[in-house]
Structure formats: structure tokens, C-alpha cells
């Protein structure tokens, strides 16, 4: 079977040698979750907007003499409204069900997935280096981020690939297929941004921080075929899957289990460093350390491009409130706090010159090619048709 699809998805998920196979019943349950999530976005979220702007906000202005001052005050008001309470409950239920239905097919086929991963590693172009002595950061293992069972650091055995398989299929369902067939829109958009913005830039070595299963890593292999590409993450199961997935797609990447705050690479080793939706899944202590490590690892003239959603100063208070629901209902404790951090100031403090730090927008490569807009307004992959990128140069 070349892809897993139904009429609801914007595009079928692209096939590769590690994609977990779902039987008929499992596909039906996965399709239900996808349509359930699509219903929340298309039928309930617009009602949340209307309720706030036409009911909650005017009533508060009448009583208090001023509009709600910030997302926190909006939250205090909206959590009293039954429509928002229903929305928040449905969002949480849909997320927990998502992982449950994907996990069914992974647990059923896990021996085959492990065997496939071993087979892909026998004649590898790239490499996989794990470090069982690595102390996993508390922010990553103290909570199941995205409500994903086991989180990023979960591991069920010495050859386990469960976390990687769960993340790969789960992200596709969570994003409603809008990240493209290979879940790679952030990486593809960032890679295209670098090529368009710096047409003469020829990186010799590239590093992807917090690569998970390599969704955003592989576009850089294609964009810069002459470069040696490395990718790191803290989860061994994620990395086993990432390595096997990349090999099945014919992409040469060197994966290693490392903490992005303190890697074992030498000073100035990379010409290009990238990350995709990493910052908001770290912590107030880790983020400055990651920026300092980025500065250390960049060669003179090197470029770093970190893709994420916009900081709160770039949106109005209501959209801040809607996006901050990820903090409250999707096990993302640093989601809201990160968007209040002055990333430019942190980058300068890490060593980058002020004139070499800027926020830019990287247009969505997938949506531009597909010719359609993003169809949902809340969650990890919203809003708009571009990714906010923090660009730093050394």
C-alpha cells in the first residue's frame, strides 16, 4: 500500500519503509479522530471567536469599563463559558484518543517495525550513535509532551522504535495532513528560506537540533546535497526510527543522541544550524543554553535558523489566548512562556551581534506548492501560511 489516506486529508501521508501499517479497523479509527479534530477546527473554533467578540468581551467592557487586558484575563472570562469548556474538553479528549488509536497499530506490528529498522541499518549511508548514559532533561521527560504516551524519551527495550512510529503517524493526524505528505513543511520552508535569502551560501556541515524523527531534517539533505548533515535528539526510540526512516528514503544523515544544550561537537563545526518547533518544548533554563551552544558550534559566517510559531507580541490578545490553550490542555508547559521571551535579546546575550539577529517569515513551502491555505486556527501548526524563523549569523 503506497499511502494511508481518506477523503478528509489534504494529502495522503507519504509512504516510506518505516511507516506503521494500519489494518482496516485501525484506519477507520484513525480517520474518525482526524475528522473529529477537523470538526473542532471548522465548527467549534469559529464559535469560540464569535462568543468572545460578540458576547464575552462586550459584557466585560460594560462591567469593567475596559476590554480584557491580556490573554490571562481573557482566559479567566472564557473558562466560565460553557462553549469554551466544551471546546477545551473535546480538544483534550481528541488528543488522547489520537495516540490511543495510533498506538494500536504500532503495538500490533512492533516486531515487524523493529525488524525493518534493523534491516535498514545493515547497509546504512548515514549513522546512528546512541548514548545510554545521557541524562535526559527533566523538561522533556517530566511530562508527556503533546500527551504522547512515554513522551520523547520513552523507550520500551533495547531496539524499540515505538516513540518514533507514534510521533510520525500521530503528527500527520494531529496536523490534519497540512504539514505535507512527509510531515516536513517546517523544514522544507526553512530550507527554502535559507536558499532564497542566502543564494551563495554553501554549507559544508549542517546540524538539526531536536530532530525527533527527522521530518524537518531531510529537506536540508535535499536542499544542500553537498553538505554533511547531522541531527540530534534526546530520545533513543525516536532516533532509531529516524535513522531507519531516513535510510529507507535514501537520505544520508548522521543521527546522535545528545542534549542540544551541551553537545560533543567541536567549536565552529557547523555552517548551518536549524531547529523546528524545538524552543517551545524546552524550558526557561534550556533555551538560553541552546542559543549559547548554537553560537559555539557555528563557524564564522555561519547561519542558524530556528523555526517556530510567532511570539505573542506578533499577535493580538485573543489569538494569544487561543494558542496558549496548548499550555493548558496539551501538556506543553513552556508553550506560552516561550512566546513571551525576548529571543533577540537572548541571542545577543549568547554572543551574536545585534545586527546579525532578526525575526523573519518563511512562507510555507507545502502550502505554496499545493495552492491552498491552512484550514485551522488553533494548535501547534497554526495560524497563517508562514513560519516564524529566528535567524542569527556569526
Where are these regions (language model features)?
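N-terminal auxiliary segments of SAM/dcSAM-dependent transferases
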Residues: 9, 14, 18, 22, ...
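Conserved alpha-helix/loop element of class I SAM-dependent methyltransferases that forms part
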Residues: 166, 180-202
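A short acidic, Gly/Pro-enriched loop at the edge of an enzyme's catalytic core
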Residues: 261-273
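C-terminal alpha-helical "lid/dimerization" subdomain adjacent to the S-adenosyl-L-methionine
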Residues: 305-369
Amino acid at each position: 500500500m503506497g499511502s494511508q489516506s481518506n477523503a478528509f486529508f489534504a494529502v495522503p501521508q507519504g509512504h516510506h519503509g518505516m511507516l506503521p501499517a494500519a489494518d482496516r479497523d485501525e484506519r477507520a479509527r484513525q480517520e474518525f479522530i482526524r475528522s473529529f479534530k477537523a470538526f473542532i477546527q471548522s465548527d467549534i473554533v469559529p464559535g469560540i471567536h464569535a462568543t468572545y467578540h460578540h458576547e464575552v468581551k462586550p459584557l466585560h467592557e460594560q462591567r469593567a469599563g475596559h476590554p480584557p487586558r491580556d490573554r490571562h484575563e481573557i482566559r479567566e472570562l472564557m473558562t466560565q463559558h460553557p462553549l469554551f469548556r466544551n471546546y477545551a474538553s473535546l480538544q483534550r479528549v481528541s488528543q488522547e484518543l489520537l495516540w490511543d488509536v495510533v498506538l494500536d497499530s504500532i503495538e500490533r506490528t512492533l516486531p515487524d517495525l523493529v525488524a525493518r529498522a534493523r534491516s535498514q541499518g545493515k547497509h546504512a549511508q548515514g549513522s546512528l550513535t546512541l548514548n545510554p548514559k545521557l541524562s535526559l532533561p527533566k523538561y522533556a521527560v517530566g511530562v508527556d509532551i503533546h500527551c504522547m504516551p512515554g513522551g520523547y524519551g520513552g523507550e520500551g527495550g533495547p531496539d524499540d522504535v515505538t516513540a518514533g512510529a507514534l510521533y510520525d503517524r500521530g503528527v500527520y493526524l494531529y496536523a490534519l495532513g497540512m504539514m505535507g505528505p512527509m510531515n516536513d513543511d517546517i523544514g522544507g520552508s526553512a530550507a527554502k528560506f535559507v536558499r532564497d535569502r542566502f543564494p551563495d551560501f554553501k554549507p559544508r556541515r549542517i546540524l538539526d537540533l531536536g530532530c525527533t524523527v527527522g521530518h524537518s531534517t531531510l529537506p536540508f539533505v535535499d536542499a544542500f546535497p553537498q553538505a554533511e548533515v547531522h541531527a540530534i535528539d534526546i530520545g533513543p526510540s525516536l532516533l532509531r526510527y529516524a535513522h531507519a526512516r531516513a535510510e529507507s528514503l535514501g537520505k544520508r544523515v548522521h543521527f546522535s543522541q545528545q542534549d542540544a544544550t551541551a553537545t560533543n561537537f567541536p567549536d565552529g563545526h557547523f555552517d548551518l544550524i536549524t531547529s523546528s518547533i524545538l524552543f517551545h518544548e524546552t524550558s526557561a533554563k534550556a533555551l538560553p543554553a541552546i542559543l549559547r551552544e548554537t553560537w559555539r558550534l557555528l563557524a564564522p559566517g555561519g547561519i542558524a535558523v530556528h523555526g517556530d510559531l510567532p511570539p505573542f507580541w506578533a499577535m493580538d490578545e485573543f489569538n494569544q489566548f487561543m494558542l496558549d490553550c496548548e499550555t493548558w490542555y496539551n501538556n506543553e508547559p513552556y508553550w506560552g512562556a516561550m512566546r513571551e521571551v525576548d529571543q533577540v535579546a537572548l541571542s545577543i546575550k549568547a554572543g551574536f551581534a545585534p545586527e546579525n539577529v532578526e525575526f523573519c517569515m518563511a512562507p510555507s513551502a507545502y502550502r505554496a506548492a499545493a495552492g491552498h491555505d491552512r484550514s485551522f486556527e488553533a494548535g501547534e501548526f497554526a495560524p497563517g501560511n508562514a513560519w516564524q524563523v529566528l535567524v542569527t549569523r556569526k
